[in-house]
């Protein structure tokens, strides 16, 4: 399976694509294509969809996995932090769904995985922007699952809710 590695940090995408090749994850004529994309931009996500189709001709699996965080007392978190977290964590998934579900359908089927968090199932203090966005991802993913089961059963949808994991998220 060929893979598009999309990240707002292009050198990180290039590094991961190289690791996939070095570790033997890519077999036969599969390749990893590193692409810089800011998922907070609907236009950039749409361009990612076009680039994916241009490079590989089909899309069968999408993982919406971008995430950022800001915290503090709900009423003291700067509005710019609220907007940033919502744009990346919720709107980025919405843009991914809107762009890639039609491409998966056109490609004959597949699956979309949206990463939420345990914070999307609970409401931990001092994490309101993150938790609100991840609750939205859970709700969107559950609705998407049912919508696809009726309209396009060849396409599945899942939501991933990991617990605390050491990442580069900030």
Per-region residue spans from a language model:
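Substrate-binding pocket helix/loop in short-chain dehydrogenase/reductase
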Residues: 73-74, 78-83
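Active-site helix of classical SDR
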Residues: 97, 133
């Amino acid at each position: 399976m060929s893979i598009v590695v999309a990240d707002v940090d292009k050198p990180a995408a290039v590094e991961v694509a190289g690791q996939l090749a070095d570790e033997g994850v890519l077999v036969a004529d599969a390749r990893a294509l590193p692409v810089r994309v800011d998922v907070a931009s609907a236009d950039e996500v749409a361009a990612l969809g076009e680039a994916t189709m241009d490079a590989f001709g089909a899309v069968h699996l999408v993982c919406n996995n971008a995430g950022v965080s800001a915290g503090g007392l709900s009423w003291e978190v700067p509005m710019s932090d609220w907007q940033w977290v919502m744009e990346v964590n919720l709107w980025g998934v919405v843009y991914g769904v809107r762009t890639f579900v039609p491409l998966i359908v056109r490609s004959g089927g597949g699956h979309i995985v949206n990463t939420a968090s345990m914070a999307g199932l609970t409401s931990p203090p001092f994490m309101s922007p993150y938790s609100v966005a991840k609750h939205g991802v859970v709700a969107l993913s559950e609705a998407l699952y049912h919508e696809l089961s009726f309209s396009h059963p060849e396409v599945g949808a899942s939501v991933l809710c990991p617990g605390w994991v050491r990442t580069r998220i900030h």
